[in-house]
Amino acid sequence: MSERVISPEPVPDDADEITLRPSTLEAFVGQEPAKNALRIAIAAARKRGEPIDHILFAGPPGLGKTTLAHIIAREMGAAIRTTTGPVLEKTGDMAAIATALQNGDVLFIDEIHRMNPVVEEILYPAMEDFFIDVMIGEGPSARSIKLTLERFTLIGATTRQGLLSSPFRDRFGLLIRLNLYSPEDLEKIVTRSAEILRIPITPKGAAVIASRSRGTPRIANRLLRRVRDYAVVEGDGTITAEIAGAGLALLQIDELGLDDIDRRILSVIAGDFGGGPVGAKTIAISVGEEVRTIEEVYEPYLIQIGFVKRTPQGRETTPAALAHLKLNHSQKTLF
């Protein structure tokens, strides 16, 4: 599923994503509550002459968690070391990284919810008291060595906050939730990215792309690049509202940012099963996808926009979904 045009996860086409990232909070568009909290935390830490407190970013993928981590390090004048939860399999992996950190450094762990629980546990004293205990040797001769660490800031990013243990979450001084962006903020992001990439675009062209980006900057930037290609081939290179609409239609992305598989899922529930309820396994079989893909990739956005409801009996479509699909099926009434 990594090649899906409207996937919020990174795909190979996103090679210039780093170029488009803002480098300051001032340049970062949207997420005002998060930015306000970070401004205060950064200013307070700098006045005290201390590293900023540990921070956990939570929210859907593609909203700027990694970008904000780099901005924090930059505004604190700190070096940043980045890694991901899945690669931290052993305590030795974390010990090697932690002991190399200098005073004030930022350690950013993406997908922190996928970190080995054993590694998570050695972070407890590292986050609170800046030391870790490492076991040397095996069997009866094994012994614990205490390694003192420099004061550092841990920034974690997660799309599944509920998978983190309560003791781990409680050790973060700031827990910041990022939400889907408004069309207005996405329009600003598209316009900014077009300027950086030197893509001619009209305000209405930017608005069309923004409205179909599922509230996610990563998707907005990806669609901008795809529509740029269409504008060069089918137009004069300028992205107008008409060019944007036609280019996205060619990609089978409708006015709400739904693609063909999204619509097939809705059609299965609404058309084949009378509006539901229907189980995820049945939906997955009907559209030729895995259950996990349905639950983690497609379903969240359909729920967020109010097209699908989860019930104890299964998934149901809403009247809004039926109106979008232009279906007249009546939803089942559950007793």
UniProtKB/Swiss-Prot annotation:
* Single GO cellular component term: Holliday junction resolvase complex
Instruction: Enumerate the subcellular locations listed in this protein's record, separating them with semicolons.
Output: Cytoplasm
Residues given in the record as DNA binding sites: R310, R315
Q: Where is this region: Small ATPAse domain (RuvB-S)?
A: 182-252
Q: Where is this region: Large ATPase domain (RuvB-L)?
A: 1-181
Give the binding site residues for Mg(2+).
T66
From the UniProt record, which GO molecular function terms apply?
ATP binding; ATP hydrolysis activity; four-way junction DNA binding; four-way junction helicase activity
Q: How does it assemble?
A: Homohexamer. Forms an RuvA(8)-RuvB(12)-Holliday junction (HJ) complex. HJ DNA is sandwiched between 2 RuvA tetramers; dsDNA enters through RuvA and exits via RuvB. An RuvB hexamer assembles on each DNA strand where it exits the tetramer. Each RuvB hexamer is contacted by two RuvA subunits (via domain III) on 2 adjacent RuvB subunits; this complex drives branch migration. In the full resolvosome a probable DNA-RuvA(4)-RuvB(12)-RuvC(2) complex forms which resolves the HJ.
Family assignment from sequence similarity: Belongs to the RuvB family.
Protein name (Swiss-Prot/TrEMBL) = Holliday junction branch migration complex subunit RuvB
